[in-house]
Amino acid sequence: MANIMNKTLKTALLVCALLLAAACSRKPSFVSVSDGQFIRNGRPYTYIGTNFWYGPILASDGQGGDWHRLMQELDTLHALGIDNLRVLVGGDGPDGVFSRVEPTLQKAPGVYNDTLLVGLDRFLAELGRRDMQAVLFLNNSWEWSGGYGQYLEWATGEKTLIPLVDGYRPFMQQMRAFQTSREAQELFFNHLKTIVGRTNTVTGKAYKDEPAIFSWQIGNEPRCFSDDPEVRDGFIAWMTEAARLIKEIDPNHLVSTGNEGFKGCEDDMELVERVNAIPGIDYMTIHIWPFNWGWVRPDALREDLDAAMDRTSRYIL
């Protein structure tokens, strides 16, 4: 009888060990795309998301860090059913620049605030504990996190204009140069490789194996800011290179451009199609700015709401 029990126990332990080994060797459930649908765990997948650009700053032990606030906000969002957060990896350039978020992550080319890098790690770990995911964007066509302008400034030494000081039109004209500046683009690509190739110091997972990452986004609203064919070709070329690099380092996660759509492509549907036909781009993004685009009046928001919703529906379709 004892021998039978021992054999049964050994068999049970062996089965448990095999199941545990299989579970440990199984890759996390990354999201994929198929026939215009997100797929997770073999089933169509939908989510509710929001912007949460400052998450890694809150998660850090340095300037701007607030762990209690982060826990409260993540728990509140999770309870509301919001499980996908769009997050800035980190700002570029020195602190103290008007209209730029701070503290910044990349102080100079390849020089990082390590406290914020760990903050990003901790943030992703907390998302994972709640089965939430992040869309991580790496660059920015606008000034508020450095982005195009800071890379150009590092590459050329020319001071970046600030839209709220110098005007949006002069700023956008200056930003066209990023599309054809190989030096500025290389600085960004180096940053991309550093972040996408990182290993999480909290979970021990390489970012490419991190289930808390939903996708990489090349930038926040990347634009070419030009009708010039040469500039547009440069725009497509550097984003093609960025998508290739991300997929080369991390074949597990989705990649998107972060582009606004029609408005982000100089009101040119041909450019929209080119942007979203870039190899390695898994899904299209669209941003809606009814107020900024004049679809609603500041003193008549309620009256204009239905018309704005109609224009939004037509814009998406």
Task: Locate each region found by the language model.
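Active-site mouth of glycoside hydrolases
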Residues: 28-296, 302-316
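Repetitive helical segments and hydrophobic/amphipathic motifs
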Residues: 16-19
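C-terminal motif of bacterial Sec signal peptides marking the signal peptidase cleavage site
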Residues: 22-23
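Bacterial N-terminal signal peptides that target proteins for export
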Residues: 2-13
